[in-house]
């Protein structure tokens, strides 16, 4: 439903504030990106409802705000985070295939954040069809972040150990829980869409 993301965002934030380590830079970054993009989406939906305007805020303004929010978040993350190999791009299943992005890390990260946000938006529409894909992706990210943040598992699987990333699995679990809570509200509408 319209403004349904606000309910998901609320459930997510309650869980993260209760269970996650709020001194962890990874959690703070995830909270910032999620809340800022969530508020932007809520404002867009609010404008659609209040002014009976199906387009909400203009596409140019929306993408501009997304770029600004993402650049600010990634820049702060790079400035405050203390990861030795932060700008390295690792390829799974290839032990020595590592690309150091350098300062290209910031635009690359911004592109990934904005692309992910808009992909979920396009998948979702008004009938909640993005819930299951979001749950599956969050489960994969939870596994990857837990393994990367565990020195024993990361050494065994020959992937880089990054201290503190295991905390992101709590954030991903909160995403899964809040999405599962919304499934009962979106199931009927999605089923009707499939029949038509």
Regions found by a protein language model. Give the residues of each.
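Alpha-helical transmembrane segments
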Residues: 8-39, 73-79, 85-89, 94, ...
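Anionic group-transfer/hydrolysis microenvironments
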Residues: 47, 68, 187
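Membrane interface segments of multi-pass transport proteins and intramembrane proteases
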Residues: 50-57, 96
């Amino acid at each position: 439903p319209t403004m349904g993301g606000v309910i998901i965002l609320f459930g997510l934030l309650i869980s993260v504030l209760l269970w996650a380590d709020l001194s962890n830079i990874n959690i703070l970054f995830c909270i910032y990106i999620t809340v800022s993009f969530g508020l932007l989406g809520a404002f867009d939906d609010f404008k659609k409802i209040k002014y009976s305007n199906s387009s909400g805020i203009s596409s140019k303004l929306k993408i501009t705000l997304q770029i600004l929010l993402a650049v600010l978040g990634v820049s702060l993350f790079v400035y405050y985070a203390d990861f030795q190999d932060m700008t390295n791009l690792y390829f799974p299943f290839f032990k020595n295939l590592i690309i150091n992005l350098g300062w290209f890390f910031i635009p690359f990260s911004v592109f990934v954040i904005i692309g992910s946000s808009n992909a979920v938006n396009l998948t979702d529409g008004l009938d909640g069809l993005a819930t299951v894909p979001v749950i599956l992706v969050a489960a994969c990210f939870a596994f990857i972040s837990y393994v990367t943040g565990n020195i024993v598992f990361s050494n065994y699987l020959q992937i880089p150990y990054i201290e503190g990333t295991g905390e992101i699995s709590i954030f991903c679990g909160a995403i899964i829980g809040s999405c599962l809570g919304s499934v009962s509200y979106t199931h009927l509408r999605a089923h009707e869409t499939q029949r038509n």
